[in-house]
Amino acid sequence: MVDEAQELTDAEWQMLLLRCPSRSFTVVGDRAQARHGFTETWQERLRRIGLERITMASLTVNYRTPAEVMAEAEPVIRAALPDANVPTSIRGSGLPVVREKVAKLAEILEEWLAANAEGVACVIGHPGFAERARVRSLTPTLAKGLEFDLVILVDPERFGDGVEGAVDRYVAMTRATQRLVILTS
């Protein structure tokens, strides 16, 4: 099983091929989350690194991220990767994406913590923010693969330019399982 396969370099693939002479892998990856770009199709990439018998299946259903969040996240990734596989959310949270100023960060967190006895929030993109009980502080890269009830993005346009910046914004947005808040300076 190879997870996050979109991030592997050719050298890393060669290492895996040496350790698995049968060349039988289950490969899981998302081109929309490839920070350093992924211009090939999966078929092209896997053939290029030496795999020949390839059976593909694409995930089309998103169980984690509510429709309200995906409606904001999809255009972000499609602007950089128009053919990205963006799965369809099967549920809504009933909570709209909120846009506010960075000055509202503490107030938004306090209100959420008071209203939610359980769950974890994550502030993404604010390096000076101090973690506390039930509130994490991460970079977009470190948030990859994780999920949080509330995600607060701080100045997401500062996450970078081009494909890498778009991927970081998309990944950060899609960590939300209930609510997304986008704060700008």
Regions found by a protein language model. Name each.
Residues 1-2:
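Walker B beta-strand of ABC/ABC-like P-loop ATPase nucleotide-binding domains
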Residues 6-185:
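Conserved helicase motor core of SF1/SF2 NTP-dependent helicases
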